């Protein structure tokens, strides 16, 4: 590019060459100069002076300071040639220091744009630069990226050119922090597209559209931009601008989508920030506007506008208001609309000034002045008192009635703010919709370029919910950049087999994104909290930290800072750590409005306000599910969910386009021009992935082209590499083309489907192409100019001759004009002509009448056409209605999805409630444990009291022993109580563990639900993708229908692929329906499981209540017992006192003795009562223990059932996951098949090389074997015969292998042809559409010419009108038939193809007839014009015109006859097409027979191998066997030669069988691995159960050891089986090696025998070929004779066919020779397949052995199960005996209670202890029996699974055996059907060639007819011009 084209902008874009040379002239030592880290400038320049042993380097800075730095911190410096380079990807040393230095130097010279690989880096200059003028736009228009300096216009031009060339939508993404310049650059891009579109074609309408596009941004900035701390004109909303273009690059329309308007700014701004610009523009406006809006000029008078700053130095609000009004006028805003926006803005300002106060002595509120309310109500068109009333006393719905509710001052203030925010947001959305309507030019749309300008990343002092949504959006966009630049790029290299070392990309942001948007992320928790009425910001915070703190590194607790705002949590984003304040998040997310005030707004007289709230739906007017009103009310969707939905839509739009990234950099925080903060820039470069993206772009291959596209575009560079005489694949052509050019061959790589180029290499190719094209065009122009000059010279010669003739005539006239007779002629001539004028007038009148009739007829025809047009429009409207109905159904589906989401949220809420209940139960358990602790304390106190009693009873010697016994008894009872307490504690722990288990199960179920929902979403995405693919297929099919007459040959090939796609789609749809049913079943299972959990919780609660009651009873008993103990203590004390008194007295009276006796009786009675109470307590405690144990057993059983249900659900989930994986694998089968084919090809080639190597080795051993030949012949003739047979088999298999490899190569060629034909079809379709449009225009012009001819010719026109009417009727009929055929083609493609073929043939014949008639009509019209001109001069010419008219009539009759003949020809062609169809169907049948024959041949080959193994004959029969083998060999060769064509067709079937065998292997391996996993899982489960029982039951240790021993035994058996399998594989490989060596020896011996038989076989082959040649020549000669008798043209065609037939014979001969080699390859492949089949059989046998072993193990397990059952029965019997003993003991205990006073206390205690021991043993036995039953159940399940596995293995073995038997039978039948198939194939080939030639004839005739039509149209136009001139 010439810098002079840029004008004054050149100095800011690129340095001149002299300046660059001056910069690059500095000397640099690359080994010493380097960059070192610096604290102030990040990196500074230094020079290496030396190094030390510890790895440090001594450097010297530019200031002379010497430093020692570690070597790894030094970064190399680039040479001066790269100083201020325009693309940083070209740097020699790509490091942070070099990138920073380059950006810093360019920014210092005000070069703000720099390329970094595929994307552009721009730095905000913070001042205006003259680089955006129109001359700069014109200079960048159409320039390649390498031609012009870096600029945002270059990015826009690149996107524009990619859109036109690649026919793909584009997008330009601006990313960066706030204040980096995203909005300004997006404005310049929009300006560029608008200006360039205006340059392409200047139209009034188009010019208006460009002006409107430029002005739309002004309105959006006024209403959506505001001043922030970092930016004076910051966009507080995101926008995605789609600029739609037509097919030729014309700008057709523009639409805008907005995202996340910051509503909170309307009512509050931080210090230093400002409200939206429109508020201050209105306040700075003229007085008339102030009077209209009732506002003043001071922003401080309004609360909503004065929270922060009120002025901006860089903005003039008054001028901005004028620009806003001008933009609204240009966009066509009506005055009501414009002032409606102003009024609502003013109303919001007055709204903010409204104040309220408390009424004195009342609790109600009232307005503190009504002035502001009156102003706001006036501007909004509502009643002021009603507004205030609705704010203070809103109506709410309670049940079915409405009730007024009083509000507080805070609530009213919040309601006013919410209404203001909602009003402004709705007004802004209305503005965007209005701008979109204005920018919709109703022109055709083809592609679009999207421009994304999203609010930049924000880290403010006070960060709220808006900042979280903004930063989340930037996280998603940065992740999209990483995914597109790093993941997709490197995956493309791997997929295309390009050698590549993966490069990591800085930061992976998915973890942070998941933390925000995953099901239990921040937004999800916020949504969940908004659903609960009692939720607060504090509950949201606690739930957030409970779920994620400590689990996610991106969530942190903030450090308290008194200087800043309070932060509740911090998030680690890619751009830094951001503290968030959650105050008011729930209210912001709900975004609730005062519905009473909204109802007043809906009745407003202000039309704009009423329309804004027209669609608002209250919370009590929700539409029931299933109705079709609208998708979702505004009140039912939160801010977070709406933003998340819009963001997902934006990401899908971006992923459907080709993105172009612009990374905007903020140079400094203070907004000072020219200053660059290095650390700030480095942080942005690291976060944006600039270095990694540049490295990938430099080392990778960012540009790539399909082989066909590359061949089509660059074939002009070397046309010699594309010979027209033979076919060359696209890849081979690309390789030869690039290899022939003088270029750097390291700059490109060849992939599988594409050719990849380094960055900038395509620009070199484009330059070479432009140079070649310029040469071609100059040569073409020279030839054309020479031709034109020759034509001009010839015209000059003709004019000279005409002048000479005219001069001669004038001289002759001058010589005779004075003769007398000549003067007499001059006088008589006018008189004669006057008599003829009347006749001419009469003739003209007749012509006028005839023309009037013709005009009436044409009008009638026009009316008919209008009626048809009306009917077509009606059909179009019907289709539109159908489309709308489908859209409604789609909306219903979306509503159902939303309903499902709601139900999911409700279920989650239910789960939350259950978890809360569980927490309550846990609290109850904690209370119980606390009570247990209290009981322990009481026991401790009782122990103290007992000790006191012991000290007191020591005094009495007589009662010492009794008191000691009592104390012992009491201590034992206390121990028993402690045991009870410990048991209760254990039970509480068990219940608590059960609760915890239920919680874990619930959590697992929630995870299952989330995984199922994800799987459902994936399936829905797959359905959407399949629907999109289906829609594309439908469009392609409709295009094919329009151009079917040109694509008949290719349609047959595409039909099968279409049917396969449709069948696969139906299959996928059915599977999806099955998956949905299974998903619903899973949901029902989850519901059932939740019901079970609820039942378990109920039972737990009941048990807890029972425990509580029992504990209360226990406490009551203890209290009574304590009382008894206290009374007993008192009595013992009294007794002691009495004894002391008795001892003191010594001998007292009888009264005292009676008193003592009474006291003793009382004491004994009390003691008896106490013992009865203790017995009662013990019986009740035993019963309670028993009940508690039973309840625990029931709970354990229920828990086990739940675990079983859980296992089933997990198994179902795994099955579903496997089925989903199967679906995905089916989708990828085509690619796998292709890859497998290529792998097989490489495998065949490797085997071929190995065979050649082995053959070389064998030749060395040939001499030794020849010496031992006689000895071998004498020793074993039988062995020699076997060797000969194996040699024959090897030769046969090698031929088949060669055939297979050649067929694979042919298939590759066919695949490339198909891809090429598909691309050609696409181009042909586009060309056909253009031709169709041209034909329509020409047809209209032709109608006009015909109308003019009607006025000139009366008689001719009458006849032509009749003919035209007939023709048009026929055409209409044909078009209707075509439409019917199109409809039928959508149902059945086969019938449509036939119908369209017939219709096309008829249309072609009619077109030919019409063209011939029009040609003759043009000739007749030209003759008639000559006649009329001659009649004006001479009367004699009138007779000639009559003759010409008669001749024309005769020609017309001849043309009519020709038309009839053409119709007959059409009928004949249709019959031939039917015959061709029949032959095609017969060929299909023959193909199927050939497939069966191929299978029979394979079976025969297997039989031959068996015969080789089984054959045992003597040496004397060797010669006979030799002759038989030779004859059989010749026969096999003849049959194989005849079946070569069939083998080509059946190659795909053989490959399919190979794939099936491989799949069967994989299936067996997968099943074995699954079974191993199941065994491993079973072992783990057994281990877990054994570990859990080990702590509680020591007796279960033996069973655990036994189970582990069995598992070890099974693992050892498995290892032994694997060793056996590996040994068997080794033996098979050794056997195959030995077999290969024997075959090599056989081949050497057989070569000597083949030499003698080769001559005979060659002669026989030549004879057979000659006979076939003769037969083919005779048939073709007969065809040629029949064609010669028809027409002379047929004779020429038959001669050509004869030549082609001879060439075909030669081709057949060459093909036969090539197929012989292929047959050898096929034979080798068949042998390999047999080996593989044998291996599969061996594997099946091994699997069967494994199954047998598994069955043996199952039998062992069943025996163990029987033993377990016996032990269980024994335990049951012992339990019954124990129960009987317990009953006996209870009876004995009752008897002992009666004898308690008389009996011994020790015996009772022994009995009680025995009872307790028996009860403990009973409980232990019960637990053991339960565990044994559970183990038995598990063993039964294992046995069932093993038996099922054995049955499956047997079924697989039987299936494989049947497949092998079928293959062998098919190989046997193949040989018998080969000859018939070959003859049929030859017949079909000959018939197909004939039909192909006939089709070529038809096409040639069509081309001739088209050329005649064009000539006739040209003549008709010339004739029309002549008639107009006359």
From Swiss-Prot:
Region (Actin-binding): 647-669, 749-763
One term under GO cellular component: myosin filament
InterPro entries reported for this sequence: Kinesin_motor_dom_sf, Myosin_head_motor_dom-like, Myosin_N, Myosin_S1_N, Myosin_tail, P-loop_NTPase, XRCC4-like_C
Residues recorded with modification N6,N6,N6-trimethyllysine: 127
Domain IQ: 773-802
Alphabetized Gene3D superfamilies for the sequence: 1.10.10.820, 1.20.5.340, 1.20.5.370, 1.20.5.4820, 1.20.58.530, Kinesin motor domain, Myosin S1 fragment, N-terminal, Myosin VI head, motor domain, U50 subdomain
Residue ranges occupied by any Myosin motor domain in the UniProt entry: 83-770
GO biological process entries: extraocular skeletal muscle development
Single Gene Ontology MF annotation: ATP binding
Keywords carried by this UniProt record: Actin-binding, ATP-binding, Calmodulin-binding, Coiled coil, Cytoplasm, Methylation, Motor protein, Muscle protein, Myosin, Nucleotide-binding, Thick filament
A Pfam family per the record: Myosin_head
Binding site for ATP: 176-183
Subcellular location: Cytoplasm, Myofibril
Residues annotated as domain Myosin N-terminal SH3-like: 29-79
Residue ranges of coiled coil: 833-1926
Comment on protein domains: The rodlike tail sequence is highly repetitive, showing cycles of a 28-residue repeat pattern composed of 4 heptapeptides, characteristic for alpha-helical coiled coils.
Family as reported in the entry's similarity comment: Belongs to the TRAFAC class myosin-kinesin ATPase superfamily. Myosin family.
Role according to the record: Muscle contraction.
PANTHER family: MYOSIN HEAVY CHAIN, NON-MUSCLE, MYOSIN-15
Subunit structure and binding partners: Muscle myosin is a hexameric protein that consists of 2 heavy chain subunits (MHC), 2 alkali light chain subunits (MLC) and 2 regulatory light chain subunits (MLC-2).
Name by which UniProt lists this protein: Myosin-15
Source lineage: Eukaryota, Metazoa, Chordata, Craniata, Vertebrata
Name of the gene: MYH15
């Amino acid at each position: 590019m010439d810098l002079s084209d840029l004008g004054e902008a050149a100095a800011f874009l690129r340095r001149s060459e002299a300046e660059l040379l001056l910069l690059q002239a500095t000397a640099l030592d690359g080994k010493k100069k380097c960059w070192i880290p610096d604290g102030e400038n990040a990196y500074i320049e230094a020079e290496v002076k030396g190094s030390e042993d510890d790895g440090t380097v001594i450097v010297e800075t530019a200031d002379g300071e010497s430093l020692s730095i570690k070597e790894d911190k030094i970064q190399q410096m680039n040479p001066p040639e790269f100083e201020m380079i325009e693309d940083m990807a070209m740097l020699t040393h790509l490091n942070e220091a070099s990138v920073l230095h380059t950006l810093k130097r360019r920014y210092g010279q005000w070069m703000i744009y720099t390329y970094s690989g595929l994307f552009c880096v721009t730095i905000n200059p913070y001042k205006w630069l003259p680089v955006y003028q129109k001359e700069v736009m014109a200079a960048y228009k159409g320039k390649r990226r390498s031609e012009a300096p870096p600029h945002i216009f270059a990015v826009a031009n690149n996107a524009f050119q990619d859109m036109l060339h690649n026919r793909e939508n584009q997008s330009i993404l601006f990313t960066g922090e706030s204040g980096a310049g995203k909005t300004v650059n997006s404005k310049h891009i929009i300006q560029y597209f608008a200006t360039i579109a205006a340059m392409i074609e200047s139209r009034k309408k188009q010019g208006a559209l460009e002006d409107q596009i430029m002005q739309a941004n002004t309105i959006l900035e006024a209403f959506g931009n505001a001043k922030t701390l970092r930016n004076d004109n910051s966009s507080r909303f995101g926008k995605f601008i789609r600029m739609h273009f037509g097919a030729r690059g014309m700008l057709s329309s523009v639409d805008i989508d907005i995202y996340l308007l910051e509503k909170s700014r309307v009512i509050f701004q931080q210090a230093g920030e400002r409200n939206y610009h429109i508020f201050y523009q209105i306040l700075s406006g003229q007085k008339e506007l102030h009077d209209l809006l009732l506002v003043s000029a001071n922003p401080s008078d309004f609360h909503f506008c004065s929270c922060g700053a009120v002025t901006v130095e860089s903005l003039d609000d008054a001028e901005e208001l004028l620009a806003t009004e001008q933009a609204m006028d240009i966009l066509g805003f009506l005055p009501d609309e414009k002032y409606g926006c102003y009024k609502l803005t003013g109303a919001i300002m007055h709204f903010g000034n409204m104040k309220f106060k408390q009424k004195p002595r009342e609790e109600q509120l009232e307005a503190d002045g009504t002035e502001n309310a009156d102003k706001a109500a006036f501007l909004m068109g509502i009643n002021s008192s009603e507004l205030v009333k609705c704010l203070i006393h809103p109506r709410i719905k309670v049940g079915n009635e409405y009730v007024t509710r009083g509000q507080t001052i805070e609530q009213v203030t919040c309601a006013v703010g919410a209404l203001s925010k909602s009003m402004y947001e709705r007004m802004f959305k209305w503005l965007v919709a209005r701008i979109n309507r204005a920018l919709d030019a109703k022109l055709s749309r083809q592609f679009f370029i999207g421009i994304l300008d999203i609010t930049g990343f924000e880290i403010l002092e006070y960060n709220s919910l808006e900042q979280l949504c903004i930063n989340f959006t930037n996280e998603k966009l940065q992740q999209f950049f990483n995914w597109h630049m790093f993941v997709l790029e490197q995956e493309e290299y791997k997929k295309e087999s390009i050698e590549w070392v993966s490069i990591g990309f800085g930061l992976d942001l998915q973890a942070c994104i998941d933390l925000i948007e995953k099901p239990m992320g921040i937004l999800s928790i916020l949504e969940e909290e908004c659903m609960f009425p009692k939720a607060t910001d504090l509950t949201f915070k606690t739930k957030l930290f409970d779920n994620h703190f400590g689990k996610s590194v991106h969530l942190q607790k903030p450090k308290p800072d008194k200087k800043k705002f309070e932060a509740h949590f911090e998030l680690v984003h890619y751009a830094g750590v951001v503290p968030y304040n959650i105050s008011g998040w729930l209210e912001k997310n709900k975004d609730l409005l005062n519905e009473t005030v909204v109802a007043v707004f809906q009745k407003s007289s202000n039309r704009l306000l009423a329309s804004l709230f027209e669609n608002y739906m209250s919370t009590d007017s929700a539409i029931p599910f299933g109705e079709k009103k609208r998708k979702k009310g505004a009140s039912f969707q939160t801010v977070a969910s709406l933003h998340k939905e819009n963001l997902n839509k934006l990401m899908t739009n971006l992923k459907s386009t080709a993105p172009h990234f612009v990374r905007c950099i903020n140079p400094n925080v203070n907004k000072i021009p020219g200053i660059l903060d290095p650390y700030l820039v480095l942080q942005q470069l690291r976060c944006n992935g600039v270095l990694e993206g540049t490295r990938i772009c430099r080392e990778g291959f960012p540009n790539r082209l399909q082989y066909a596209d590359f061949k089509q575009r660059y074939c002009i560079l070397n046309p010699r590499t594309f010979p027209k005489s033979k076919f060359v694949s696209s890849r081979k052509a690309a390789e030869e083309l690039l290899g022939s050019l003088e270029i750097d061959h390291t700059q490109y790589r060849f992939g599988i489907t594409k050719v990849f180029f380094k960055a900038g290499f395509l620009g070199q190719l484009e330059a070479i192409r432009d140079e070649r094209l310029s040469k071609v065009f100059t040569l073409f122009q020279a030839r054309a100019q020479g031709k034109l000059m020759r034509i001009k010279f010839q015209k000059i010669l003709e004019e000279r001759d005409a002048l000479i003739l005219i001069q001669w005539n004038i001289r002759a006239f001058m010589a005779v004009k004075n003769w007398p007779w000549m003067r007499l002629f001059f006088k008589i001539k006018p008189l004669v002509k006057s008599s003829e004028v009347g006749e001419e007038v009469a003739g003209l009148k007749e012509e006028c009448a005839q023309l009037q009739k013709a005009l009436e007829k044409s009008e009638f025809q026009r009316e008919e056409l209008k009626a048809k047009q009306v009917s077509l429009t009606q059909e179009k409207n019907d289709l539109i209605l159908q489309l709308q109905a489908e859209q409604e159904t789609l909306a219903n589906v979306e509503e159902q999805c939303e309903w499902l989401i709601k139900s999911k949220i409700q279920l989650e809420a239910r789960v939350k409630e259950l978890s809360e209940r569980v927490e309550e139960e846990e609290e109850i358990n904690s209370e119980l444990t606390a009570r247990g602790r209290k009981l322990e304390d009481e026991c401790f106190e009782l122990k103290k009291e007992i000790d006191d009693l012991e000290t007191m009873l020591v005094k009495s010697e007589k009662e010492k022993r009794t008191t000691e016994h009592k104390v012992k008894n009491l201590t034992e009872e206390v121990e028993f109580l402690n045991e009870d307490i410990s048991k209760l504690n254990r039970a509480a722990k068990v219940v608590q563990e059960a609760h915890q288990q239920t919680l874990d199960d619930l959590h697992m179920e929630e995870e299952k639900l989330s995984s199922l929902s994800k799987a459902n979403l994936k399936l829905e995405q797959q359905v959407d993708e399949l629907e999109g693919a289906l829609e594309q297929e439908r469009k392609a099919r409709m295009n094919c229908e329009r151009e079917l007459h040109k694509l008949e040959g290719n349609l047959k090939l595409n039909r099968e692929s279409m049917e396969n796609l449709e069948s696969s789609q139906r299959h996928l749809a059915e599977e999806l329906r099955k998956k949905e049913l299974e998903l619903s079943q899973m949901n029902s299972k989850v519901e059932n499981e939740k019901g079970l959990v609820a039942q378990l919780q109920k039972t737990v609660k009941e048990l807890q209540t029972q425990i509580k009651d029992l504990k209360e009873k226990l406490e009551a008993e203890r209290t009574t017992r304590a009382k008894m103990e206290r009374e007993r203590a008192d009595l013992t004390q009294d007794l002691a006192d009495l004894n002391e008194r008795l001892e003191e007295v010594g001998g007292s009276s009888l009264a005292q003795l009676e008193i003592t006796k009474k006291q003793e009786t009382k004491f004994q009675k009390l003691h008896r009562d106490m013992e009865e109470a203790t017995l009662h307590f013990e019986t009740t405690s035993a019963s309670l223990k028993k009940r508690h144990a039973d309840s625990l057993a029931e709970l354990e059983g229920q828990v086990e059932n739940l675990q079983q249900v859980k296992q089933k659900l997990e198994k179902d989930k795994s099955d579903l996951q496997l089925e989903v994986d199967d679906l995905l694998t089916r989708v990828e089968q085509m690619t796998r098949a292709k890859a497998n084919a290529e792998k097989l090809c490489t495998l065949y080639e490797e085997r071929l090389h190995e065979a050649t190597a082995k053959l070389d080795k064998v030749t060395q051993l040939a001499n030794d074997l020849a010496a031992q030949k006689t000895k071998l012949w004498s020793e074993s003739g039988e062995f020699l015969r076997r060797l000969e047979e194996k040699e024959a088999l090897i030769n046969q298999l090698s031929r088949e292998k060669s055939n297979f490899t050649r067929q694979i190569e042919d298939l590759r060629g066919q695949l490339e042809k198909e891809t090429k034909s598909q691309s050609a079809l696409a181009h042909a379709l586009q060309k056909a559409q253009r031709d169709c449009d041209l034909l329509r225009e020409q047809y209209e012009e032709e109608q006009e010419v015909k109308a003019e001819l009607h006025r000139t010719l009366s008689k001719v026109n009458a006849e032509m009108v009749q003919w035209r009417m007939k023709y048009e009727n026929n055409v209409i009929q044909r078009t209707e038939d075509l439409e019917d055929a199109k409809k039928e083609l959508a149902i059945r493609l086969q019938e449509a193809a036939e119908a369209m073929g017939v219709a096309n043939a008829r249309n072609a014949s009619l077109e030919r007839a019409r063209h011939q008639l029009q040609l003759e009509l043009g000739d007749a019209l030209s003759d008639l014009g000559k006649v009329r001109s001659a009649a004006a001069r001479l009367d004699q010419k009138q007779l000639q015109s009559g003759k010409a008219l008669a001749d024309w009539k005769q020609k017309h009759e001849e043309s009519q006859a020709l038309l009839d003949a053409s119709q007959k020809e059409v009928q004949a062609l249709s019959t031939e097409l039917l015959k061709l169809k029949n032959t095609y169907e017969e060929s299909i049948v023959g193909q199927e027979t050939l497939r069966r024959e191929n299978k029979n041949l394979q079976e025969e080959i297997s039989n031959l191998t068996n015969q080789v193994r089984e054959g045992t004959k003597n040496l004397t029969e060797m010669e006979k066997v030799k002759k038989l083998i030779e004859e059989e060999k010749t026969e096999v060769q003849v049959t194989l030669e005849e079946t070569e064509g069939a083998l080509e067709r059946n190659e795909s079937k053989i490959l399919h069988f190979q794939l099936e065998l491989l799949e069967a292997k994989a299936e067996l391996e997968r099943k074995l691995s699954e079974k191993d996993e199941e065994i491993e899982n079973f072992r783990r489960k057994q281990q877990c159960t054994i570990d859990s029982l080990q702590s509680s039951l020591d007796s279960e240790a033996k069973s655990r050891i036994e189970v582990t021993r069995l598992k070890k035994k099974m693992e050892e058996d498995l290892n032994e089986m694997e060793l056996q399998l590996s040994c068997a594989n080794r033996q098979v490989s050794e056997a195959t090696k030995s077999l290969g060596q024997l075959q090599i020896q056989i081949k050497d011996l057989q070569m000597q025998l083949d030499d003698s038989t080769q001559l005979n076989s060659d002669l026989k082959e030549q004879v057979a070929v000659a006979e076939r040649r003769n037969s083919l020549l005779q048939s073709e000669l007969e065809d040629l004779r029949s064609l010669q008798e028809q027409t002379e043209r047929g004779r020429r065609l038959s001669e050509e066919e004869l030549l082609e037939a001879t060439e075909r014979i030669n081709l057949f001969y060459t093909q036969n020779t090539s197929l012989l080699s292929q047959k050898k390859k096929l034979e080798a492949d068949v042998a390999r397949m047999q080996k593989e089949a044998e291996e599969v059989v061996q594997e099946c046998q091994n699997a069967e052995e494994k199954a047998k072993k598994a069955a043996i193990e199952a039998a062992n397990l069943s025996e163990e199960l029987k033993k377990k059952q016996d032990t269980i029965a024994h335990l049951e019997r012992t339990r019954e005996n124990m129960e009987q003993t317990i009953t006996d003991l209870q009876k004995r205990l009752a008897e002992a209670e009666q004898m308690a006073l008389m009996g011994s206390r020790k015996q009772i205690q022994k009995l009680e202890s025995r009872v307790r021991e028996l009860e403990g043993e009973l409980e232990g036995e019960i637990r053991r029996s339960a565990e044994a039953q559970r183990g038995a159940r598990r063993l039964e399940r294992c046995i069932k699974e093993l038996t099922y596995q054995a049955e499956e293995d047997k079924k697989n073995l039987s299936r494989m055996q049947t497949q092998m038997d079928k293959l062998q039978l098919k190989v046997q039948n193949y040989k018998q059907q080969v000859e018939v198939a070959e003859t049929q194939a030859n017949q079909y080939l000959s018939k197909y060639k004939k039909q192909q030639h006939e089709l070529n004839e038809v096409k040639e005739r069509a081309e001739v007819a088209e050329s005649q039509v064009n000539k006739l149209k040209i003549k008709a136009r010339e004739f029309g011009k002549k008639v107009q001139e006359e």
